[in-house]
Amino acid sequence: VCSSDLELFAGGWDESGYVNGSGVTARFDNPRQPAFDQDGNMFVPEYGRHTIRKITPTGEVSLYAGLPGQAGFTDGLPEKARFNKPECVTVYLDNSLYVADRDNHLIRRVTVE
C-alpha cells in the first residue's frame, strides 16, 4: 500500500496576484510548468504576469526575470528582460534557464553571471 501527502508549498488556492514572500503568503498569476536547478531551486514561468519566479527549497518566492505585468520582448539582464506569456522552463547543466516565450514565438535563454 502506497501512502503520500499533498500539501500547499507556495501560493494560495483562493487568491491570485503578484506577491513575493514565504510559502503560502506568496501569490501567483497563472503559474505554468516549473523546473529545478541543481541546488533545488524551482523556477516557475508566470504566464499571467510575464515573469519567471524563483522558489528556494525553503519556500521563499522572489522575482527571477521579467517585470510583473509588462509583456514584451527585451533581452538583457534578468530584471530588464521582458517576456510575453512564458509557458515552460528548463534548466540546463550550467544552470542557464531556457524559457518557452509563447506569444513572442521564441525560446529564450536566461543566464546569471
Residue ranges: model-predicted function:
Residues Y47, R102:
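Short loop/turn segments immediately following the C-termini of beta-strands
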Residues T111-E113:
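Short loop/turn segments immediately following beta-strands, especially the blade-tip
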Residues N41-F43, S96-V99:
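Conserved beta-propeller blade signature
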Residues V1-S3:
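Short, small-residue-biased leader/transition segments that mark boundaries at the very start
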